[in-house]
């Protein structure tokens, strides 16, 4: 039986609540699904802050994907390589030295593959 595939563009936005490391996470990939990211993009709309770390999070374990040591304010940083995010995992991006009320954006573009026996 063929896999069912849906194209997705998943935008996320968060306002940092206190000074320190700001973190934004995607939703966890649902059971029976795999998210194939063809592009992952991050920005801090508010200001130039500390280093950006992009990773895949699976429970308490993280797998690093990219690192940007000196990002500019309100500039998109993209990870253009195809990345498979399995069920239960999520994409996470952290930025050091954020201040309260910084606005962080994360956008995932790609497609979702469904197991043949999973209803959408």
Which residues does each PLM region occupy?
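Beta-strand-centric surfaces of beta-sandwich/beta-rich domains
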Residues: 1-120
């Amino acid at each position: 039986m063929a896999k069912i595939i849906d194209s997705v563009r998943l935008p996320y936005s968060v306002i940092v609540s206190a000074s320190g490391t700001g973190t934004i996470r995607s939703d966890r990939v649902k059971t029976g699904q795999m998210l194939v990211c063809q592009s992952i993009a991050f920005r801090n709309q508010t200001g130039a802050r500390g280093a950006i770390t992009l990773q895949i999070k699976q429970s308490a374990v993280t797998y690093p994907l990219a690192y940007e040591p000196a990002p500019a304010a309100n500039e998109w940083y993209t990870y253009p390589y195809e990345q498979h995010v399995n069920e239960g995992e999520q994409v996470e991006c952290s930025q050091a030295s954020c201040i309260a009320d910084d606005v962080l954006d994360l956008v995932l573009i790609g497609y979702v593959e469904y197991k043949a026996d999973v209803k959408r």
